[in-house]
Design a protein with these regions (language model features):
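N-proximal low-complexity "stem/linker" segments adjacent to membrane-targeting elements
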Residues: 1-29
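A conserved acidic beta->alpha catalytic loop
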Residues: 26, 43-51, 68
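Glycine-rich, basic loop-to-helix element that forms the pyrophosphate-binding segment
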Residues: 65-83, 93, 104
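Conserved donor NDP-sugar-binding/catalytic core segment of glycosyltransferases
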Residues: 96-134
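Short, flexible, basic/aromatic active-site loop/helix in glycosyltransferases
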Residues: 137-176
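A short, conserved alpha-helix in the catalytic core of glycosyltransferases
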Residues: 169-196, 200-230
Length: 304
């Protein structure tokens, strides 16, 4: 009789062979005897040595190969077809976890059946906390104050700091709106209730969408800083300076992800907020997204 799977880990990878190896080594150290862990790596049409490395060095991994880059949502949904665990951990290939992380996250979720998803404190390899592990939902006001830079000036303000909610105590566990797809620990029955990742998002925004649906369904989303993950932010997309040298994201992929980051804002707003705000606010928000997109693509084109 096969053992019950406690946690199914899905790691999505596209041309991150160096980081993927480090991620899997850290996961191996976290595969403690008291937990039965299923590990699934979904390769999103990599052209580097990622597939060969997984097959040769990590035979305990279930490898799923996609001939096409399905994006973040599509790739994770492909991995979900193999899931057997009571819990699911969506883990980026550019993340390394602490040896005790999985045990602690499961224990935390076990203590409260109303928690649908949680995320730990995520720190950047270059230093400091990754703010995206602790977010409010991107309402028009939260987004406006964030993009105008008011959150940086007044990070503890409940009016100007809604985007990352840094007015809350970051050293103790508490409920939040949205965590981070980089390390997203979800109860399997929660995901069955709310549905899989929305594949209209290619890259960016899909994690906030999923957290939003989890909250809508009445589950709690928790920030749990008593365990830690380390993040090479931007390595998967190749959009950030610190990703250079550790990823081989092509110019085509980087342009596609830059466009997707803007499209995600529009998809999310139309899906969840269009009916909540009047037509004038909606017109202003959508126009703002278009303008933001033009500036982002201009900045991208000037970097080459």
């Amino acid at each position: 009789m096969s053992k019950k799977v406690d946690i199914s880990v899905i790691i999505l990878s596209h041309n991150t062979e160096i980081l993927l190896r480090a991620c899997l080594i850290s996961l191996l150290k976290a595969r403690r005897g008291e937990l039965h862990i299923q590990t699934i790596v979904v390769d999103n049409a990599s052209t580097d040595r990622s597939i060969q490395i997984v097959k040769k060095e990590f035979p305990w991994v279930e490898l799923v190969e996609s001939r096409k880059n399905l994006g973040y949502s599509g790739g994770n949904n492909l991995g979900l077809k193999k899931v057997k665990g009571e819990y699911i951990l969506f883990l980026n290939s550019d993340v390394e976890i602490k040896p005790i992380a999985l045990v602690r996250m499961k224990q935390f979720m076990d203590r409260d059946a109303k928690i649908g998803a949680s995320t730990p404190k995520v720190e950047l390899f270059r230093g400091g906390m990754d703010p995206d592990c602790h977010r409010g939902f991107p309402t028009p006001l939260a987004s406006l104050t964030y993009f105008l830079g008011l959150e940086k000036v007044f990070p503890k303000s409940r009016i100007f700091g809604q985007y990352h909610q840094f007015y809350l105590d970051l050293e103790i566990p508490h409920e939040i709106d949205s965590g981070f797809g980089t390390f997203m620990f979800v109860r399997s029955k929660t995901l069955k209730m709310v549905g899989n990742w929305d594949e209209r998002y290619f890259f960016y925004g899909e994690d906030i969408d999923l957290f939003y649906r989890i909250k809508q369904a009445g589950w709690k989303v928790m920030y749990y800083p008593e365990t830690l993950a380390l993040h090479h932010k931007g390595a998967s997309s190749g959009l950030r300076k610190e990703s250079q040298g550790v990823t081989v994201a092509s110019k085509e992929i980087r342009l596609k992800t830059a466009k997707a980051s803007i499209e995600a804002m529009e998809i999310f707003y139309k899906k969840f907020y269009k009916g909540k705000y009047n037509s004038l606010i909606t017109m202003i928000v959508l126009a703002g997204i278009k303008i933001k997109g033009l500036f982002r693509l201009l900045k991208f084109s000037l970097s080459f």
